[in-house]
From Swiss-Prot:
Active site, renumbered: H473
Protein name per Swiss-Prot or TrEMBL: Oxygen-dependent choline dehydrogenase
Gene behind this protein: betA
Signal peptide: none
Role description: Involved in the biosynthesis of the osmoprotectant glycine betaine. Catalyzes the oxidation of choline to betaine aldehyde and betaine aldehyde to glycine betaine at the same rate.
GO cellular component term of the entry, any: membrane
Disulfide bonds: none
Organism field: Escherichia coli (strain SMS-3-5 / SECEC)
Residues that hold FAD according to the record: 4-33
GO molecular function, one term: flavin adenine dinucleotide binding
Amino acid sequence: MQFDYIIIGAGSAGNVLATRLTEDPNTTVLLLEAGGPDYRFDFRTQMPAALAFPLQGKRYNWAYETEPEPFMNNRRMECGRGKGLGGSSLINGMCYIRGNALDLDNWAQEPGLENWSYLDCLPYYRKAETRDVGENDYHGGDGPVSVTTSKPGVNPLFEAMIEAGVQAGYPRTDDLNGYQQEGFGPMDRTVTPHGRRASTARGYLDQAKSRSNLTIRTHAMTDHIIFDGKRAVGVEWLEGDSTIPTRAAANKEVLLCAGAIASPQILQRSGVGNAGLLAEFDIPLVHELPGVGENLQDHLEMYLQYECKEPVSLYPALQWWNQPKIGAEWLFGGTGIGASNHFEAGGFIRSREEFAWPNIQYHFLPVAINYNGSNAVKEHGFQCHVGSMRSPSRGHVRIKSRAPHQHPAILFNYMSHEQDWQEFRDAIRITREIMHQPALDQYHGREISPGVECQTDEQLDEFVRNHAETAFHPCGTCKMGYDEMSVVDGEGRVHGLEGLRVVDASIMPQIITGNLNATTIMIGEKMADMIRGKDALPRSTAGYYVANGMPVRAKKMSRDVN
């Protein structure tokens, strides 16, 4: 089998490339996905409110675990990644957050990455998006990804939480993806007008999969990339339960889009990476790149949970006798509780003046429950998910064997810097202050978790060690740049090799301020033009907010938070 391009991984970036490259009917593409189809009849992946279900099994989740995390009481922590057409966009929380403009401007300060500034990238965010309330300078109106904006009146807790943030002295913003990210406001989400999850399989592949020049293979586990000298010329994979490898040749390029965990694994198995690591497993060295699998980053977060004094939370939706009605409303009308991910309010703030742009993110949820659906509080409640955005901690992904089905050694080194601890202490204390603002007086009861007895630095630190969780945002393991630890250049081409690019969240030099899916899709759109040799979309002229020394908040609070 021969194709112009072979794409490894049908996720948030791979599906973008498959769709854009096959717009030319003379270009042939093979798309390999280790998982299965995105079954449209399976409510677990298609109903937004069911977002916890895919994380509970292994049909749609690789369900990786970390090595014991040394600064987290040696816990082995979850590292869920999407498996199936859509990748992690098939199982994520559907929050459509692009990050802060200064994240991208920060990338663009690196020599050779100048065209990754916010204004260079904004046209590609817009190209990917159809926003339900219409296009403007920041949002698209005819892209493949459906974006739904929170509307007033859905749940009084959303508006109360935003108002409480404003009463605490932080800005209000009407669009976390628009002119000003900093502040509290409604959150966009990747949900269709009919209340279905808007994964990249639905948005992109649905328009491309009928093309004769696109071949899609599911249950195709990539073993390794085939090289002729320093040039990538094909891919070898295993289909289903078969132990007999299948091969295909790439006439132009191999495009690795397997994500921040699997992409470095595949490179290492293919002979690209740290020479010492490859020698441990007798893998012939194709090219030494010590940065492969290094620079691993993530967002860590925790929940602050509160009793809700008014019966307005989603607690009744957790009762089995209410779920048939919720399911029917969603299935037949695309409406009701089932049609939302319920992350409809959030915010970004600076915890201290030293940060030039927000370093803390909030997701508000009108129920008290773990992200994966476990440990639901058996009463009306609500919670804040809060965590730091740009931790200096760095980890790694390293193969444990040559076998493609063997999970790698993953270590994030969460909380390995003093800055991490300071940010989380600040985050807990600020959240408590916000929760005690007048807007929430009629709703908030006792603090369920961590509990008012948890006050000192030592007590807060122990709570974080025992209870903080991943936000499922790994990135950075095939870093874009030109220093000695970078893996790809500014066009995704792997240093020292030909015919091979990496296009996914692994190329982010530094993690962004927010959820990763929207930016991973943008990377796919921008790289698609580079791969095709097309001129980049014209640079945006839209303005964007820079704090530039403005106070973190307008006033200090004097209310007793205990």
